[in-house]
Every structure is written in structure tokens, then in C-alpha cells.
Amino acid sequence: HGNGYNSNNGNGYNSNNGNGYNSNNNGNTNCNFGNCNNANSFNNNGNTNSLNGNNNGNSNNNGNGNNNGNSNNNGNGNNNGNTNNGNSYDSNTNDDSNSIPNAVSVGGSNKLVIKTKSDDSSQTISLLDVFKNYDSNNNGNSNNNGSSYNRNDNGNSYNSNNNGNSYNRNDNGNSYNSNNNGNSYNRNDNGNSYNRNDNGNSYNSNNNGNTNSFNNNGNTNSFNNNGDTNRIDSNSYNSNNNGDNSNTNSVLVPEPTVIVIPAPVQQSVGCVCKPDYDPLLYTDNETYNNKCEAECEGKTVWYDKACY
């Protein structure tokens, strides 16, 4: 669905600004330092300074980069450090025309910010509105229209999920998981793992190593297990399109084949076997592995048609 690695449903490409990872979907979406316009734009940034968030469409902002905090939009509007499940708004604007009546968010120092129209004389705020608009987006976990599970023990973990189920686990390191329209499972135990899944099921497991896995799947199950064992190259790029492909460009080291090459044995001169052992009684095609004691410097030797 696109050109190159990490392109979703169009000509969008990933751009890295510092530790930020930016993915644009659904058409020719242009992004500049987190400015993503043209509907359905998903911007995943970690530790990146951004001028603006995502505008003009269903926007999802994920990580510690854009909009000065962890923000999540599940509707049309702009976010600036707050999370709203529904119609969102800019909590820092001074223009009442851009505000929505009865919109409630949580500000600093446990303050409630109530945005109303300037011509409204009275407002009724319910506790349900408060809880609906409460900022429950922590640790870079963002979910649009689906289930998203994000676990981060010791490191940075950014999980973005749109229209599907995304499971992201990061124990010790940096893990970036972006999932659009499908199921994505990303686990990173010790190292850096980058998992990208567009329109399909992707399973990425990275244990003990710096492994970059870029997986663009079209209705294909790809199982990519990368570590520091049985691999020649620590970087694996797995791209599947409408087929069953497992461990693309991954070279497994086969079990070694043991080949024993015996050292050459010099034949002794003047060795005579005992009289009770007559080699002439055996056929020529029989292998002689019987011991015989020869007069070869008083040593016991093996007999194979000749004394050695």
C-alpha cells in the first residue's frame, strides 16, 4: 500500500526528527514537524518538538512530542495537551467561536476548564461530561476506534492504534508501535523495536538486540522473531504482500555438519602378526577391524590387510 517501507495507503512516508517517528496515512499527507493536514493523519512522535498537532480531520497524537503532552483525539478538532473522547477543542484558545458549549477538560492544579459560548447565560455541567473529557491518556497510549493495550516497564513506549486492536509491551528499551486497520502485536524486551502494520495482522517480537522490523502487510500473517541468535544480520526487513511469507531476508544458520578426516597413517615395515592370526583366511572385501599384536616395536596395532 505505497512506496517503500512504512508507507500507508498512499504516498506517505515516515520522517524521523530526533526520536520522533511520523506516519501519515490515507493519501498524500504532508507533515512538517507534526503539522499534519488532510484528514485521517496519525502522528506518532517521541521526544520531538512540534509546532502544532494534527488539524483538519480525525487526528491522533501520541507520545511526548506534539501538543505539549499526551493527547488523544477521537473526533474532529484540535488537541493541546488534553484528551477528549468526542468533539474536542482547543483548551487554550481565546476565540469563543471555536469552542463547544459544555466542553469540560482538566487543567493544571486539578482545575476544571469550562468552555462556553460568549452569548450563553447559563450552563449545566454534569459529572458524566467531566469523566468523559478526563485526560486518561498516559504513557503514550493512544487508541482510536478499537482496543489498545500499552505496557511500559522501563523505557519509552508509544502505541498508536486506529481501527483495530493493538497490543504493545515494552520492558526495557524503546518500542514504537503503529497499527492502522488491523491487529498488531508488538513486544520488546531489551532493545529497540519498531513495528509498523497497515491493513493486516503483524506479530513482532524482539528480544535482546537492536532489531528494526518494518512490516507492511496486505491481509497476511507475518511472524518475525528477531534476536541475536541464528542470525547473520541483526537488521531484518520483512515486507509481505498478499501471500504467506515468514522471516523474509532472514538467514538461519544451519546445524553444523561434522566431518572427520583421519590423519594419514604410515605403514610400518617388518610387522608380522601372531601365527594364530592369519589374514589370508578373510576375503578381500571384508574390513579388518580386529586387533592383532605385531612385532612392531612391541605395540598393539590394528590390522587392515596390513600391519600399521
Curated annotation (Swiss-Prot):
Component of the acid-insoluble organic matrix of the calcified shell. Residues 47-99 have a biased composition (Low complexity). Its main location: secreted. Residues 1-21, 47-104, 134-250 are annotated as: Disordered. GO terms for cellular component: extracellular region. It is found in: Secreted. InterPro entries: Kazal_dom_sf. Gene3D superfamilies: 3.30.60.30. This is Insoluble matrix shell protein 4.
